[in-house]
Each structure stands twice: as C-alpha cells, then as structure tokens.
C-alpha cells in the first residue's frame, strides 16, 4: 500500500531523483567529523589553542568516535604572500608553522584541516589575510605540501563587480565558477583533500556543489541564539534529499559545549544535525589554558547512538514530516540501515510536556522496539502511537526497530478474537472520511460475507475481501464478524480531491500569478497574501468532522542578510473552515533552484505540508487561506498558495 506519508507530505519535486553527479574521490562516504576553531575563538586562533584542542580530541575519546578533522579557521594568515607568491602563516600566532601543525596532528592520528577563501581576502579581515582568488592552483599545491587533508573554502571579498565587499548575498555572478577552479586544482595535487564548500547557500549549491566537493553549506552562519536552530532547519528542508555518500548538506558547525544552549537545546541541536547527515564539527573549546568543556555537553557530543545515526551506512537524510506551528512541535524522520527508522519530535516550546508521535506520520504502523535515546528508555510492541515527556526545547529522539508499514494491521498484533468476532484496535485515520478502503487477508481462501462495525458507528456487510468503510480522524476500532480466521487487514486512506488555486477567489492584495514551467502541479499560484487579504472558495464534503489537508505552498524567503538578527526564513500560512479558528503553519523553504539566477528565483518550487482542520459539515464548506497573525510579527506576506488536496 502506498503510505499516507508519501501521499500527503512529499511534493512531486521531492519524489523525483535528486542525487546529482558527485565528486568521486573516495572521501566522505559518511559525513566528516572534527573540530574547528571559529565558533569559540572566532578569527583569533593560535598554535597553542589548536594543539591543545586537538590533543583533547584524543584524550577525551572523541577522536575514537570519529572526530578527526582539525581545522584552524580564519585568523591564521597574513596580508601578503611570500616573494614567490605562496601563502604563509602568521609566525607570531603559529611560530612552528603549518607544516609542523600538520605533522603534529597526523602523529596524534588526526587529520589536518586548512581554511581558505575564494575571494581576495579571508573572512575576518581586517587585519587583512590574503585569499586564494586568482591563486587557486598555487594554493592547492601549497596546502598539499603542508600535508592538508581538508579545505574549508569560504566566500568573503569575492564579488568583483561590487569591488570585493566583505559580504554580498546577491552577487552579480554565481560563486560556482570560483569553486570549480579550486575543486579542479585540488584534484591535481596528488593528495586526497576533502573540499568543504562554504558559500553560505547562495545560488542553491545543492544543484552543483556535489560535483565539486564533499559538502556544501546550506545557509548563513549559525549564531549563538536558540532561534538560529529553527532558521537552519527551515533552510535544510529543500536540501535533505540531495545528501548521500560523498555529498553532504552542511548545517554549519556545532555550538554544543559553548555555554550558549541549555542541555535539552544542545540535545536538539546535535540530534537534528546528526540525523540530517550534516558534517559534525565541534565548535567548542575542548581544552585550553583557560577553559575546558563541561561534562554534560561532552556526553552529548559522545552519544554513540546519535553519532551512529549520522554515520549510518545507508547515508539517507531525515526529512520534515509534520509541523504543528500553533502547538509548537514537529516531526522529522528518515531510514537507517538494518530496516531501522530514526525519528525526532522537537518541542519548540520552552516548557516540559508530553508529546505523541503517531507512527503513520513517518510511514509506520508498528515498531517491535522503540529506543528513546535521550530518555534512556526502551519500549516494546509500539502500536500506532508513542508518547513520552520532552523537556522544553528538547527532542524525543527515537530509533524504531522491527517496523511494519502504515496501514497494515496483523491480527496477532492489533486484534483480539473471540469465537467468530475479531476486534482491531489502534486503527489510525488521518482524516474523517467514509472512503477508506479495507482489505482483509484470511488465513485460507474464503469468499464469505463478513459484517464490519467501526467505532464511527457504521455497520456494513461486504462480500469477498475488500470494501469501503468510514473512520474518524484519530484512533478507531474495527470489529469484524467472520467464519474464516483473519490474518491481517490493510487500510488505504482516501486519495481526496485536489483544488488548485485557480478555483479560489482573492481579496485585498492577494493575486493570481502564472509560473512558467513551475508551481507544480498547476503552473500558477496565489501570492501577496497579506493580513488584510485572503483566498477563499466553497468545497463540498461528504461527511462531518475533521479533514486532513495536504497544502501545496511556495516559500523562498532565504533571509541571508537578516539571519544575523531576528530575520526569519519561514512564512506564515493559515486556513480556516466555515469561519472557525484558523490553523496556522510556519512553512519552511521550498525553493530548489537559484534565488538569484533561475527563471523563478526559487519561487516556482512547490512543497507540501499537511494539517488537520476541524469544523467541516456535510455539503458545501467555506475554506479560506490567508495570513492571520501576519500583523503580529510573522512574515508580512504569507507563503504563496498553489493548491490543496482535501481528504474526504
């Protein structure tokens, strides 16, 4: 059976194959792990700092867990090259030199990471430090001669058309050609050097970076504020299915251990970076003359299960499955090797509470084992849902084993039988509908007529093995009167009816626009939904109750320049039924093309998220999409609205 998760939560763009040609140098078969100086020491590293932190990787047992790349970020170089044109280090800060640094790291069993820039100067200038622009071939050879194992390659002072400013988030040309040049130069040095592309997500590098390097930054820098976690995850949503062996979406370095986040926040940060298959780069001061990492944060970084999710051989990123904006939580999930599944339920509220995972939201109906990683508990025989306490800003991180796909209910797990009556419990319904398809598998061939009673109050008789039944959104029971023993039942949700934006009327500033080849599946959308406007239509329903809506939206509010402050890359979108209370979604980014140079600038790329709406009546229903709450601090304009599938 096609999973309801596939039906409701994946846009056509995400279903299509998206692993682009990738560099094939044998590196980064799993996401790289290590330590970088920037998040704690900014652009002020020195030899003693790097060496002491590198030794701490070994002494604290982190190197044995895979943290091996040690990178000195900005602040290591000087303003001028040597007379022969080669790069050199700041001899005051690094008196032994970079070749000696590489030798020291290699003797510790670690890997030597260097940092460069595709512009005229390194980030962090002034004081000026020379970049690699127009010197790529020479610098690649120099890095190799020093014994470098990786290169983080930044994007400052790089836009010639605007006289090489420190930062330009809207350059006149793509950063791609500069990264192609360095990638080619590295390929010729005769030494494997892992290339980390760090151009901040400009020009949607997921489309081209995998052919050049082993990882690409998806967005602007993480900042030492909790809100940056939500912003980064929103940016990650359209990148997740590009990840794979040798090509990883980089969510930026970790702030775990820097005294910025609470312990639950650090667990959330580390969990999501891990399951999205981001490189795991420690940004904390592990050990120097003045400080050392606290034990609780160290235990987060050393959590072997979470590291195992990141380094899993299957190499598939988790993706966003559901988001409840008003309720303040969301669900991410992805497959692991060994037929396992990892699930993260994030509690965005700053209060502890119980949260429930409905397994069908991640494509499952049953788990033989549920391991709660941070809760340190193991539960067996999980049927349809799992509930646990989650700390404020914390995450319920689960490893599910021995799973059954959603919609399949084996009698030995879900049913109780007496004589010729079998009652199935924990039957999940995403929507209230009389159009669910029930298929019965008997233990032996049978053509008998059976009587079915559902908890919605329906009683029907069906001949053969299948029929249509009514279920209510939530948990249901089904009782079957029969003679032949039942092995299992399978329930398929209704496919529903799709309503394109073109059948909606608009008010205020809202307007219909066409999209060239984009805005799948209809080629148009409604944009400019401000708080004083909406899109409305009348939609028929065959039953009373709550209905699941799969909403097609577009958002490419990348918010590069505003991300340093309170800038948000989510967009508000609300839906109300029959003038009832609106259900609100803060939708993440959907753009999967360049925000600068593609025909639609990423605003033609459709994604899908689902919500459950109440207040439906039999017959015609007034359905309104808008931007309620936009006047209260959410985005001035809602996400663009493409269409909606109503499951009735």
From Swiss-Prot:
InterPro entries for the chain: Aldolase_TIM (IPR013785), Glyco_hydro_27 (IPR002241), Glyco_hydro_b (IPR013780), Glycoside_hydrolase_SF (IPR017853), Melibiase_C (IPR041233)
GO biological process: polysaccharide catabolic process
Keyword Zinc belongs to the record: no
Residues annotated as glycosylated: 84, 90, 339, 505, 572
Cysteine disulfide partners in this protein: 123-156
Subcellular location, record wording: Secreted
Main location class: secreted
Keywords recorded for this protein, A-Z: Carbohydrate metabolism, Disulfide bond, Glycoprotein, Glycosidase, Hydrolase, Polysaccharide degradation, Secreted, Signal
One Pfam family recorded for the sequence: Melibiase_C
EC number in record: 3.2.1.22
Active site: 154 (nucleophile), 221 (proton donor)
Binding annotation for substrate: 199-203
Catalytic activity: Hydrolysis of terminal, non-reducing alpha-D-galactose residues in alpha-D-galactosides, including galactose oligosaccharides, galactomannans and galactolipids
Residues making up the signal peptide according to the UniProt record: 1-17
One cellular component (GO) term of this entry: extracellular region
GO terms assigned for molecular function: alpha-galactosidase activity
Similarity comment: family membership: Belongs to the glycosyl hydrolase 27 family.
Role: Hydrolyzes a variety of simple alpha-D-galactoside as well as more complex molecules such as oligosaccharides and polysaccharides.
Name of this chain's protein: Probable alpha-galactosidase D
Source organism: Neosartorya fischeri (strain ATCC 1020 / DSM 3700 / CBS 544.65 / FGSC A1164 / JCM 1740 / NRRL 181 / WB 181) (Aspergillus fischerianus)
Phylogenetic lineage: Eukaryota, Fungi, Dikarya, Ascomycota, Pezizomycotina
């Amino acid at each position: 059976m096609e999973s309801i998760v596939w039906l409701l939560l994946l846009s056509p763009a995400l279903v299509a194959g998206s692993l682009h040609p990738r560099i094939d140098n044998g590196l980064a078969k799993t996401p790289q792990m290590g330590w970088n100086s920037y998040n704690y020491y900014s652009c002020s590293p020195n030899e003693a700092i790097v060496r002491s932190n590198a030794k701490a990787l070994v002494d604290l047992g982190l190197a044995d867990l895979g943290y091996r790349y040690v990178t000195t970020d900005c602040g290591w170089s000087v303003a001028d090259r040597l007379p022969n044109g080669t790069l050199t280090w700041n001899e005051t800060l690094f008196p032994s030199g970079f070749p000696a640094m590489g030798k020291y790291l290699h003797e510790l069993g670690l890997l030597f990471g260097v940092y460069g820039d595709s512009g005229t100067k390194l980030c962090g200038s002034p004081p000026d430090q020379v970049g690699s622009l127009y010197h790529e071939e020479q610098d690649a050879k120099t890095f190799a001669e020093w014994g470098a194992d990786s290169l983080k390659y930044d994007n400052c002072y790089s836009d010639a058309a605007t006289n090489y400013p420190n930062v330009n988030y809207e350059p006149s040309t793509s950063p791609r050609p500069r990264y192609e040049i360095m990638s080619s130069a590295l390929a010729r040095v005769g030494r494997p050097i892992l290339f980390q592309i760090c151009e901040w997500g400009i020009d949607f590098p997921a489309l081209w970076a995998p052919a050049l390097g082993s990882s690409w930054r998806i967005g602007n820098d993480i900042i030492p504020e909790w809100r940056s976690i939500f912003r980064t995850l929103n940016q990650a949503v359209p990148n997740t299915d590009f990840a794979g062996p040798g090509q990883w979406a980089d969510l930026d370095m970790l702030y775990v251990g820097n005294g910025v986040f609470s312990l639950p926040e650090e667990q959330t940060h580390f969990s999501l970076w891990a399951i999205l298959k981001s490189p795991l780069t420690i940004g904390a001061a592990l050990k120097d003359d003045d400080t050392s990492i606290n034990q609780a944060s160290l235990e987060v970084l050393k959590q072997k299960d979470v590291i195992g999710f990141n380094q899993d051989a299957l190499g598939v990123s988790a993706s966003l499955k559901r988001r409840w904006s008003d309720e303040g939580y969301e669900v991410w999930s992805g497959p692991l090797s060994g037929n396992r599944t990892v699930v993260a339920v994030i509690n965005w509220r700053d209060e502890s509470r119980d949260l429930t995972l409905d397994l069908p939201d991640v494509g499952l109906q049953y788990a033989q084992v549920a391991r709660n990683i941070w809760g340190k508990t193991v539960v067996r025989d999980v049927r349809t849902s799992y509930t646990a306490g989650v700390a404020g800003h914390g995450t319920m991180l689960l490893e599910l084993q021995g799973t059954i796909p959603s919609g399949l209910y084996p009698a030995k797990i879900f049913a109780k039988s007496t004589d010729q009556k079998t009652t199935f419990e924990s039957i999940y319904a995403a929507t209230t509908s009389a159009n669910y398809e029930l298929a019965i598998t008997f233990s032996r061939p049978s053509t008998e007529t059976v009587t079915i009673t559902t908890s919605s109050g329906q009683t029907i008789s069906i001949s053969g093995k299948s029929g249509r039944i009514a279920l209510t959104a939530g948990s249901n029971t089904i009782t079957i009167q029969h003679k032949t023993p039942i092995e299992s039942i399978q329930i398929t949700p209704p496919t529903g009816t799709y309503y394109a934006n073109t059948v909606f009327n608009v008010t205020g500033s809202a307007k219909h626009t066409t999209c060239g080849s984009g805005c799948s599946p209809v080629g148009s959308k409604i944009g400019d939904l401000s708080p004083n406007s909406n899109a409305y239509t009348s939609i028929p329903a065959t039953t009373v109750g709550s209905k699941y809506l799969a909403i097609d939206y577009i958002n490419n509010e990348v918010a590069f320049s505003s991300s340093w402050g309170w800038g948000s890359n989510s967009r508000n979108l609300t839906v109300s039924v029959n003038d009832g209370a609106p259900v609100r979604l803060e939708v993440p980014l959907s753009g999967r093309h360049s925000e600068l140079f593609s025909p639609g600038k990423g605003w033609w790329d459709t994604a899908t998220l689902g919500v459950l709406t109440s207040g439906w009546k039999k017959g015609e229903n007034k359905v309104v999409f808008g931007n309620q709450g936009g006047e209260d601090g959410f985005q001035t304009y809602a996400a663009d609205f493409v269409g909606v599938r109503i499951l009735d």
